[in-house]
Amino acid sequence: DIFFQHSGSMQCAAVAQATHSPYTHCGVVFIESGTPVVWEAVGPVMRTPYADWVEHGVDGHVVVKRLKRIELLTPGVVAAMKAAGERDMGKPYDIYFAPDTDRIYCSELVQRIYRSGAGIRIGEEQRFGDMDFSGAEASRMLKDRFGERFPADQPVVTPASLFRSALLVTVDSVGSAPTIMR
């Protein structure tokens, strides 16, 4: 499953404005020793117990999405997905959302786990230039990170793109989605 939330960080406020979506953070959930654990990119790529992950979001709101064709996720495929995620464990967070593999951001990690482990591409990449940076937080983040060298053609996959994927179905939602400020 893929968990989505809105984090209270300044970056997440900017991502919400740029993507017009309240879903600004995501991770892949695996069951480890009978407990749900979220594999996420937040500092280093790491495993976070579900209860801790929920606390990092706004008002405990979480949406759980699942692959519509769940039968594709056989035990062997899930093992391959975990192996794909393991390769990124400990890597630093990518504040520039660059399409390399040295640093990882949250939605990139999710997409990589599904693509490398299951051969399934969830979410569509878009160009930075196609996002809306007119909001105050989004504009500030863009200027702080890139200065005058805005990479308009740089591909990026956002939590919003993953959330909208036609390959996924919502299976649970807890709490209310926050309102995004534009």
For each feature predicted by the language model, list its residue ranges.
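Cysteine-nucleophile amide-bond enzymes
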Residues: D1-R182
